[in-house]
From Swiss-Prot:
This is Homeobox protein 7. Residues 60-80 are annotated as: Disordered. Putative transcription factor. It comes from the Eukaryota. Pfam families: Homeodomain (PF00046). CDD domains: homeodomain. Residues 70-80 have a biased composition (Low complexity). GO terms for molecular function: DNA binding. It is found in: Nucleus. GO terms for cellular component: nucleus. Residues 8-67 bind DNA.
Amino acid sequence: MIKDFNESNIRNIRSSGISTKKLEDFFSINQYPNKNEIKDFANYYQCDETKIKNWFKGKRDRLKKKSSNNEKSGNKFYFK
């Protein structure tokens, strides 16, 4: 079965730059979308609202982990 863009779902979002762009752009403005915004994304991607919520949660978690790792690496002292 051949899928067109409208039939793709959120689990394929990382492999498609087209799909990711909308979510990434929105995330850069607002990391916590409201129910209506989540519903709009779910309709656009034709998937469950839960998948959209999980994408935003995962993105926030990855960002938090990345900033935490950057802080840890910046605070290392080396003595000779």
